[in-house]
Amino acid sequence: RNGEVTRLIKRCNDFGAGGVSVAIGELADGLMIDLDKVPKKYDGLDGTELAISESQERMAVVLAPEDVDAFLAAANRENLEATVVAEVTAEPRLRMTWKGVTIVDLSREFLNSNGAEKHTTASVPDDDVKPYEFAGDTVTEKLADMLGNLNICSKQGLSERFDSTIGAATVLMPFGGKYQLTPNQTMVAKLPVLHGTTDTVSGMAYGMHPEILSQSPYEGSYLAVIESVTKLVCAGFDYKQAYLTFQEYFERMGTDPTRWGKPFAALLGALDAQLDLNIAAIGGKDSMSGTFEKMDVPPTLCSFAIAPGKASEVISPEFKEAGHAIRLVSCDPHDTAALTANYDAVLSAIRAGKVVSAWALGLGGVAEGLFKMGIGNQIGTRIDDDYDGNLFAQQIGAMLLECTEDIDLGVKVGDTVPEWVLEYEGERIDLTAMQEIYEGKLDKVFSYRGHTGETTEKFSYSAETYPVPA
């Protein structure tokens, strides 16, 4: 945060896998690296180990020669170890010396070629995605089955094992409403500033549906991107300012064309979504060795969408008040023109104050959205008699809106009511029992609720007896 120091840095790179050879080797076309000057935790490492050993918590920076002393002095004031280990050279070659001997001498042209070409065969099946069906003959039975699904039930006990308040910049806490039970779909925090205040925030949301990815890696990856972006829009962010990053896991490839076909299809689906939305992925993390003996991970691509915004324009997903209209805005997620038009319309309504909460639909469809939006403030829903949509249909890219006025956007689903109930087709469902299913599914694994009658075991670190040798 010292501007005088940061302006000295021409280029920098973080250390990680590959160590010196990657972190420093990527900084310039021509480099002379003295491995004897590289700080090490212990002696005995040879030149190869010094060059390629993974190292963390280190950074390589490029400085002008006349700025080196000033930078070293600044590092010393912060109790940081800084060492000159390399020089940028005019000749485009990567050279490394160890004990006075040049042990690496490679042309940059060769390094940039990524070595010899590699070819493989990928077989991509024409997969059909079957819609997920929740068990039950009645709305009550389907709602109970849906809320007990591991991909839908409460993860609050797990979430609360992590501190969401570090830096005191959190805008949206993980769970909203006066009961703090509505899960926020977007992580929003102010950017850190040393002086004054700021309204600028960053928003991040994820998208992933394993039940779709297992059937069709292409469709699952495409919809992962759509879902992550839709969540940002529902929090008040402009999708046109978003960027993406992906996390991927796949089984070990080997030489099996069908195994190669899974990441091929997944990345193709994610690429098509980027091209359709005109949003780029600027980074990612992948693992192509998700196999242990005969066990394979399912094909997995998780999309994270990140965008800048203003705290004053951010909304949270919990229902705010009874008597508000609930509207559903949806379309085919592959109809890019309709989808982006929906994004723009919803964002405009949010910024105009006409939409006070919004939810990006997922596996549980409208029913999941109504329940999770309502649980934070225990505000229920009365569904209109003329609403004929499927409450439990998965609709990626669709948005459920709480409106302060009955705006002309999408279709009207119903209205919020002060009782914690769901009224649908003459049936009045008490959601308190459903809440127990939702919260109790993982309570034994990730407990976060106090239970009546429990006693806390007393722990003492004062020894009353001391063991002695026999």
Each predicted region: which residue ranges?
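Glycine/proline-enriched, intrinsically flexible loops and inter-domain linkers
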Residues: 1-470
